[in-house]
Amino acid sequence: MYKHILVAVDLSEESLILLRKGAGLAEKCGAKLSLIHVDVNFSDLYTGLIDINMSSVQDGVIEETTKALDELALKIDYPVSQRLNGTGDFSQVLEEAVAKYQIDLLITGHHQDFWSKFMSSTRQVMNNVTVDMLVVPLIDE
């Protein structure tokens, strides 16, 4: 069965749904459980016209994200092996994490709304990641 499960979260309230699903599967399989959050690369969003210290902004975001991942991990009764914080292209960061940490199941969420039909990051991941995926529907109200 699975040996290492990675749960991709966006740090919204729905992240706990995904984490609980991952913890339940990990417990049944006796697998390691890890979390990952991917931030966009801020330097790609700004042009040279804006004078801003991107490294200090990025450092602050990384620190806040790490704290949020730690807090999320405390909300379940299963140990979280790794709390990963990536930056850049969502699909590429997940591919690299899957390879580096020997992940054999990736859990992501998918919003079933109008915009997700056109711009789904999960669909791109499905086309690139070479391990099993569990895509959990997140129903928008």
UniProtKB/Swiss-Prot annotation:
Keyword Chloroplast found: no
Major location category of this protein: cytoplasm
UniProt-listed Pfam families: Usp
CC terms in the record's Gene Ontology section: cytoplasm
Subcellular location: Cytoplasm
Matches recorded under Gene3D superfamilies: HUPs
InterPro entries named among the record's database cross-references: Rossmann-like_a/b/a_fold, Universal_stress_UspA, UspA
Key words, A-Z: Cytoplasm
Quaternary data: Homodimer.
Functional note: Required for resistance to DNA-damaging agents.
Similarity field: Belongs to the universal stress protein A family.
Name of the featured protein: Universal stress protein A homolog
Biological source species: Haemophilus ducreyi (strain 35000HP / ATCC 700724)
Gene this protein is translated from: uspA
